[in-house]
Amino acid sequence: MTVKDIPFWRVLLIFQTARVYAGFGDPREAITIIHQQHGKPCDCAGGYVITAPTVYLATVSCSSHTAYQPSDSLKWRCVSNPTLANGENIGNCPCQTFKESVHSSCYTTYQECFFGNKTYYTAILASNRAPTIGTSNVPTVLGNTHNLLSAGCTGTVGQHICWNPKAPVHISDGGGPQDKAREIAVQKRLEEIHRSLFPELRYHPLALPKARGKEKIDAQTFNLLTATYSLLNKSNPNLANECWLCLPSGNPVPLAIPSNDSFLGSNLSCPIIPPLLVQPLEFINLINASCLYSPSQNNSFDVDVGLVEFTNCSTTLNISHSLCAPNSSVFVCGNNKAYTYLPTNWTGTCVLATLLPDIDIVPGDAPVPVPAIDHYLHRARRAVQFIPLLVGLGITTAVSTGTTGLGYSITQYTKLSRQLISDVQAISSTIQDLQDQVDSLAEVVLQNRRGLDLFTAEQGGICLALQEKCCFYANKSGIVRDKIKALQEDLEKRRKEIIDNPFWTGLHGLLPYLLPLLRPLLCLLLLITFGPLIFNKIIAFVKQQMDAIQAKPIQVHYHRLEQEDNGGVYLRVS
């Protein structure tokens, strides 16, 4: 068959056929698109719901709310955690039976009550819930007895239900008061260990009593942004050439991604920090998730860190000693709390993770709305497409945020905020010095009293008799006076700045009193100035109209009456 034998319509059909490419494509792009639709857990891309979903893939605690990833939409839906009602104590408990634990999704508010010299929690039951093992309907059996992860709630809806303030080991109430009490207990225990090993260090990320260069943020946050930009510049220089690094306002919640580090130390060389709330990502997609498990000893010395509910543990490593996280890694345990050190008597399950800051990237060529213009023009702010840090760094387990909109800048309030924080810190420090002075004085008085009671002054003094290492009076009254004097000088300086302002000192101090009278005086002055002119104009206009009316002639129109002669007969009398 030659070319001439091929019909023309076949040739036309060949040229009109669209080119089709076959293949699965880059899986990293698919993961990025999926995460752009899902968002981060605490962003609540699926919105807030009243009741928690019955079937979900993972759950993440976000302090004030709990995020659930349901199996139908995969967007994180959030449920607000119950709060302590007004009048936190109602007296005697309205229940006769008390449960060990009640899930937080079964009530909205709770109160404290007493029964038998013990404190319990009580609330009105809003719904029933069956206890679950593992993450929803995915069972995760750990050990022989401690396998229940999520508590339930059974009873009559609309009636009071009471339960213990302390949950059993390895049982979670879904971010309710029992989980918060467990977190506080673990935090206190870690703080005790930290105080016994390291000196106390006071630092507040927002306290800037003095200017620290041109930056308007604290040094720690600035160093974090600098390190993030350096890493971004090495991994993706095109994006780092011109971009914005955006930090969310409020308490930071870092991102936790799985770590491949398998080295676990048991010494105390690692830093000990309080439990840190994180957002675990990509753990639900792990095929081989390795978890660390320490069984409970069923005693009061157990430090219950909880069980993980955001991943399925395929392999479990039993641990019976303290753990120190490897460099740049943390242990993420129950209620997605991160730890750098787990004490000897810890119990629960944890996974090893790497933390990254919750920073979003806005490319330099992306249109960013100006908040001030949008505010004054009453326009809705345009959505800014953020690029998550994980995508910018080229990590395959990339995550995108569901955040839209850009927060208002607080640069204008930096000076005022810094000054207010400085004043509050100075007052707080002064009160603390007063308290230290009172404590020191009380200790000295107590030592003298004990020494006088024992009559041991002749044996070398009270300190030697009592074998006290510290026997002096820490007089901080001078420091208190200096700080109060500094505050007074600062206030006097501000008053002087106000007094030196010509706006308030003009006319020998009479200007502030004359300002309220300025408006009526101005109105009176305008009336006196332009009143006669306006009055003359009105009089002239009226006179002109009257003259025009008088100048017009009066026209009178009349007609002669017609006389009608009928030609009648007249009688003539002679």
From Swiss-Prot:
GO biological process: fusion of virus membrane with host plasma membrane; symbiont entry into host cell; virion attachment to host cell
GO cellular component terms attached to this protein's record: host cell plasma membrane; membrane; viral envelope; virion membrane
Signal peptide: 1-22
TM stretches of this protein: 515-535
Immunosuppression, as annotated region: 446-462
Alphabetic keyword roster: Cleavage on pair of basic residues, Coiled coil, Disulfide bond, Fusion of virus membrane with host cell membrane, Fusion of virus membrane with host membrane, Glycoprotein, Host cell membrane, Host membrane, Host-virus interaction, Membrane, Signal, Transmembrane, Transmembrane helix, Viral attachment to host cell, Viral envelope protein, Viral penetration into host cytoplasm, Virion, Virus entry into host cell
Post-translational modification: Specific enzymatic cleavages in vivo yield mature proteins. Envelope glycoproteins are synthesized as an inactive precursor that is N-glycosylated and processed likely by host cell furin or by a furin-like protease in the Golgi to yield the mature SU and TM proteins. The cleavage site between SU and TM requires the minimal sequence [KR]-X-[KR]-R. The R-peptide is released from the C-terminus of the cytoplasmic tail of the TM protein upon particle formation as a result of proteolytic cleavage by the viral protease. Cleavage of this peptide is required for TM to become fusogenic. The CXXC motif is highly conserved across a broad range of retroviral envelope proteins. It is thought to participate in the formation of a labile disulfide bond possibly with the CX6CC motif present in the transmembrane protein. Isomerization of the intersubunit disulfide bond to an SU intrachain disulfide bond is thought to occur upon receptor recognition in order to allow membrane fusion.
Positions of short motif CX6CC: 463-471
SUPFAM superfamilies: Virus ectodomain
Region (Fusion peptide): 386-406
Location of the motif CXXC: 243-246
KW Hydrolase (keyword) present: no
Cytoplasmic compartment residues: 536-574
Protein origin, superkingdom: Viruses
Annotated disulfide bonds: 243-246, 243-471, 463-470
Membrane topology, Extracellular segments: 23-514
CDD domains named in the record: HTLV-1-like_HR1-HR2
Motif (YXXL motif): 558-561
One Pfam family here: TLV_coat
Record text about domains: The YXXL motif is involved in determining the exact site of viral release at the surface of infected mononuclear cells and promotes endocytosis.
Function description: The surface protein (SU) attaches the virus to the host cell by binding to its receptor. This interaction triggers the refolding of the transmembrane protein (TM) and is thought to activate its fusogenic potential by unmasking its fusion peptide. Fusion occurs at the host cell plasma membrane.
PANTHER family per UniProt: ENDOGENOUS RETROVIRUS GROUP S71 MEMBER 1 ENV POLYPROTEIN, VIRAL ENVELOPE PROTEIN
Assembly and oligomerization: The mature envelope protein (Env) consists of a trimer of SU-TM heterodimers attached by a labile interchain disulfide bond.
Stated name of the protein: Envelope glycoprotein
Species per Swiss-Prot/TrEMBL record: Simian retrovirus SRV-2 (isolate 2R-18B1)
Gene that this sequence comes from: env
